[in-house]
Amino acid sequence: MRLQRQCIVVNMRSAIVLIMIFVLTGIRNSETASGGNQMDLSDSKGDHKDNSNASNGNGNANDNEVYVPPLVSSMVAKSGGGAGGLLDNITAYSSSSSSSSSNGNNNMLCPYDKETPCDRLQFPCIRCNYNHGCIYGRDLNVTCEVINNVQCLGERSFQRQMNCRYCYQTEMWQQSCGQRSSCNSATDKLFRTNCTVHHDVLCLGNRSFTRNLRCNWTQGYRWSTALLISLTLGGFGADRFYLGHWQEGIGKLFSFGGLGVWTIIDVLLISMHYLGPADGSLYI
């Protein structure tokens, strides 16, 4: 008994509709990616300008100073200012933000709760006397003291252990860095971003700094999907449209895949990860 093979027959109208869908999708994805990248570039330029102005105006800042958010500064201005009012508003702002956080008491900053042990407080609620002459990489004990107008339980001066190193030398899991989606991940480039160490980390120098990170972001393109489309519909330029290279996709469509040569080349390029999304993102 012979087995009959079932074939799927696609007429010319269905093929044209399918190709037009890939063309419109590729154009839309490329325009969306380019528009998002321009917005990210403008935002990064604005952030860089704000950071440069802040650094020029606060050249004498050290790691023991408490950062005052703009909202708190406006609250202080409305209340009449003063050192005592400033610290009161700092604690009020910190307690309100900690109440809305779901991470519990570990992330509280300057709480009003008198039952909180003083030795559990973190930056910026404490100030520590750092020994800048310590040996790099060695663990040492430093004396920390709770800042004024912060209520806590126990001794306001206590010992805490730290590792002798500057803040920019801490591990990556001890830092929070801003990510950028305006860089090209395919070329394996580096980009400069702002990083800040976590509140529970004690270190020397400025707690906020800039560093170079490797560009690594995705936009939802799958390598397996791109390879499958290239193997099946590569002759119509569907793989190029899927990845956002719609200009090359149109040329590939009207040349019937470069008479088969272009199709084979694209299959090899996609399989070896040489051909990626047009927006510079990585495959997922």
From Swiss-Prot:
Residue ranges with Low complexity bias: 52-63
Protein's recorded name: TM2 domain-containing protein almondex
Glycosylation site list: 53, 89, 141, 194, 206, 216
Stretches of the chain found on the membrane's Cytoplasmic side: 247-249
Lineage, highest ranks first: Eukaryota, Metazoa, Ecdysozoa, Arthropoda, Hexapoda
InterPro entries xrefs: TM2 (IPR007829), TM2D1-3-like (IPR050932)
Similarity comment: family membership: Belongs to the TM2 family.
Additional information: The name 'almondex' was given due to the slight almond-shaped eye phenotype of some mutant fly lines (the '-ex' denoting the gene is located on the X chromosome).
Source species of the chain: Drosophila melanogaster
Keywords: Developmental protein, Glycoprotein, Membrane, Notch signaling pathway, Signal, Transmembrane, Transmembrane helix
Phenotype caused by lack of the gene: Viable but females are sterile. Reduced adult lifespan. Adults display climbing defects progressing in severity over time due to age-dependent decline in neuronal function. No morphological defects of the eye, wing, notum or leg. Eggs produced by mutant mothers fail to hatch and embryos display neural hyperplasia. Some lines of mutant flies show reduced eye size and nicked wing margins, however these phenotypes are probably due to disruption of neighboring genes.
